[in-house]
Amino acid sequence: MTLWINGDWITGQGASRVKRNPVSGEVLWQGNDADAAQVEQACRAARAAFPRWARLSLAERQVVVERFAGLLESNKAELTAIIARETGKLRWEAATEVTAMINKIAISIKAYHVRTGEQRSEMPDGAASLRHRPHGVLAVFGPYNFPGHLPNGHIVPALLAGNTIIFKPSELTPWSGEAVMRLWQQAGLPPGVLNLVQGGRETGQALSALEDLDGLLFTGRANTGYQLHRQLSGQPEKILALEMGGNNPLIIDEVADIDAAVHLTIQSAFVTAGQRCTCARRLLLKSGAQGDAFLARLVAVSQRLTPGNWDDEPQPFIGGLISEQAAQQVVTAWQQLEAMGGRTLLAPRLLQLETSLLTPGIIEMTGVAGVPDEEVFGPLLRVWRYDSFEEAILMANNTRFGLSCGLVSPEREKFDQLLLEARAGIVNWNKPLTGAASTAPFGGIGASGNHRPSAWYAADYCAWPMASLESDSLTLPATLNPGLDFSDEVVR
């Protein structure tokens, strides 16, 4: 029984599903998808639970959420192993994900008060108040690259605001989704407040098509986000938050410490086997001898990166991709770029058949026309050379995406120029593209999102503002508007 609906674990009535470790092939999870009727059942449960949950005080809802944080802490080792084994991540990185989940609780509570709490301003004849109210029933679609942390970034603020939820994890990470749901169960969430439906495309389509849905919060690929946007078009009454991918540029300008710049680039491009939406996909490198030296050093260090299994000791820098198919897609993308005229500097290699262990790849595309503006979700870095900083900014903005952008340079003036001209929601200076502050919004523009950034700003899309003018008594104004006559004279 792998679905959690209205406080009960039940068996899915849809297609059967088996999840294997993408490196070892070990069977980790077996179950069945939710069919359309079970998705509707989950929605009815969430709708029935909404009035009571929304009427609880914030303090009462916060108690449950903080209890969940405590369970994350006490089950950290177990959840770390589940996420690592299911995604192919290494133990060290999965542990940082669980830590991020724990930290998200306090951050979300603070963000609720700062961004969507209550405010009151006294006026001569009363007061003006601002309150926030939950939307109702929200669907949360989780991604596979951070199956605990990223859905958590939607679920926690949505619950704090008083919403009820139907959560569909990625079909590639059902075990992680179930493990997190069982912790919420232990935390004492009332039945129907959070419901878990497992499944792939058919389950997702049934969920997004629900008429009695007040909104949808999505993290994933741009193509899926676009489909959801089209599906919900003409329904302005529903909140839609889309956090999608990017074709992110990293500009390497003048470099004082080549090894430091190489380290930053590897952290930007190859961490999590290149499976972060903010990863650098395009390296824009200044022409000249210094750029040549940097590129040679980047290739030399990157070719030492050997991916390994989640529990290998000593721990490698990168693990496997989410699946053998995902790894093969990266290899295919590299082959296509090479066929277009790209110059391979470091060829990506599958270490073993039927596994997702893939070494990083680097290919130079300078002067090649018609390179697709697409996100290759894996450890493949494309390189372009530029002559002037103005040209670098034009190249950086030459994408339909707009998630992250970075600059390596000692010159503050160039960063200030980039801040003015970059089209990206995250713009970093001498910091990895994959770094983000928990007290800042997380999201992009263009094909990277629909102006609903998450993280610190997630509270914004989990509640709607209600403005009030208030007075505890009603009296006739001392001064009336022209044309109003409240005298006792009888009009003849």
Swiss-Prot record:
Belongs to the aldehyde dehydrogenase family. AstD subfamily. Keywords: Arginine metabolism, NAD, Oxidoreductase. The keyword Oxidoreductase applies. Catalyzes the NAD-dependent reduction of succinylglutamate semialdehyde into succinylglutamate. This is N-succinylglutamate 5-semialdehyde dehydrogenase. Pathway: Amino-acid degradation; L-arginine degradation via AST pathway; L-glutamate and succinate from L-arginine: step 4/5. The gene is astD. Its EC number is 1.2.1.71. It comes from Shigella boydii serotype 4 (strain Sb227). It catalyses: N-succinyl-L-glutamate 5-semialdehyde + NAD(+) + H2O = N-succinyl-L-glutamate + NADH + 2 H(+). The active site is at 243, 277. HAMAP family: Aldedh_AstD (MF_01174). GO terms for biological process: arginine catabolic process to glutamate; arginine catabolic process to succinate. NAD(+) binds at residues 220-225. GO terms for molecular function: succinylglutamate-semialdehyde dehydrogenase activity. CDD domains: ALDH_SGSD_AstD. It comes from the Bacteria.
